[in-house]
Amino acid sequence: MSKLLLVALFGAIAVVATSAEVLNLNGRSLLNNDDPNAFPYCKCTYRQRRSPYRLKYVGAENNYKGNDWLCYSIVLDTTGTVCQTVPLTEPCCSADLYKIEFDVKPSCKGTVTRAMVFKGIDRTVGGVRVLESISTVGIDDVTGVPGAAILRIVKDLALPYSVVASFLPNGLPVCINRVPGSCTFPELFMDVNGTASYSVFNSDKDCCPTGLSGPNVNPIGPAPNNSPLPPSPQPTASSRPPSPPPSPRPPSPPPPSPSPPPPPPPPPPPPPPPPPSPPPPPPPPPPPPPPPPPPSPSPPRKPPSPSPPVPPPPSPPSVLPAATGFPFCECVSRSPSSYPWRVTVANVSAVTISGGAGERVCLKISVDNAAAATCNNGLGGCCSDGLEKVELFANGKCKGSILPFTLSNTAEIRSSFSWDSTRPVLKFTRLGLTYAQGVAGGSLCFNIKGAGCTKFADLCPGRGCTVAVFNNPDNTCCPRVGTIA
């Protein structure tokens, strides 16, 4: 009887284990999400500095076995990671390879139907055969995350770390096809340059180094962190302090012009002498002349000078929500001449999110060449600094309508944004972009969906959102750098 109970118990455990695996692969219901709205939509070690796995962009492979392919290469690179010392103490430094996931547009289902792993390879390493294989794949919605979908490659991909390492330096090729007439790759990956957001998982699914790969992105991102130092001399060499003078714009000097009129009043006193022509009685009249002096007090009546405050009224037309005082923080320098980072609108496209209309907004974040050439390091010393944060003075009614963002051309994906608790300010934080990455330029993309707002014009009405940029690490410089609409 006890044996029967044990058999039943083991059977139940097997069923539960199988169900758990299915849930992990499809809906990830068993994974505790720290941020359920952020790719890769699960709790795992996603920082690239803790794993050597990278997905390097290779390019197109046309008409191979009846398909046109876009190919990448799985490589191991420890540059800028904690995986450079032996023995390896970090568990993700020597993790096995299990699957790759891409963050894709839900409405592009049917765009990718095949995945090819290990193209052109047939080799046995340590008793493990590595062989080209083509399998069927598809795009799956992410449970509980509206407007999110995943393209997953699992079949025939699993390999031990030692086998993956034996294919250095070229790595292991992985390709996906594209069905003619479907979404383009920029549409599929929701990036104008076709940059893909990816995660590489181990079999325990607790390691998921996450990054970007595309024609304009070097997936081995941590290394450039030291590169911003060289550019620093360039901006300082051509610094142009004159930029600060424009900032003072006190029109107050005009009021003094009224002061000259007071001198003319003194001439009136000469007329009083004619009255003295009469006999002694006139002397008493001279006291009346003192009343004329009262006109002189009129000059002190500069209280009319308060008229100068009238100039402030023109400021309101700057933008629908007045951005007076923005950004609301203390910085060493607020001058755009001290910090060359700029933000512009790259593109805005219509999207459907959970059956409702919305828009995807991509902002170009970069170091402006002209601003860098004339940057004045004497105003705060931020000319060669990286970018930590971007703030938008926006429509506060859009709180709850912004979905997490993706950031291209960086070593990691970050999706940290928030609204100020008391003011209508949308903040994109923890960007961690280096100066060198700013020179290359990057895209910050996010979705806008109801209920409060569904369009970029809702978020940035009128003349648009006023933008402020902050250097890292201590927000020394925080200039306003224009508006976007």
UniProtKB/Swiss-Prot annotation:
Transmembrane feature ranges = none
| Pfam family of the protein (one) | DUF3707
Q: Which residues are glycosylated?
A: N193, N347
Is Phosphoprotein included in the keywords of this UniProt record? no
User: InterPro entries given for it?
Assistant: Pherophorin
Q: Cite the entry's keywords alphabetically.
A: Glycoprotein, Hydroxylation, Signal
UniProt lists compositionally biased (Pro residues) regions at: 221-234, 241-317
Q: Name the chain's protein.
A: Sulfated surface glycoprotein 185
Naturally occurring in which organism (per UniProt): Volvox carteri
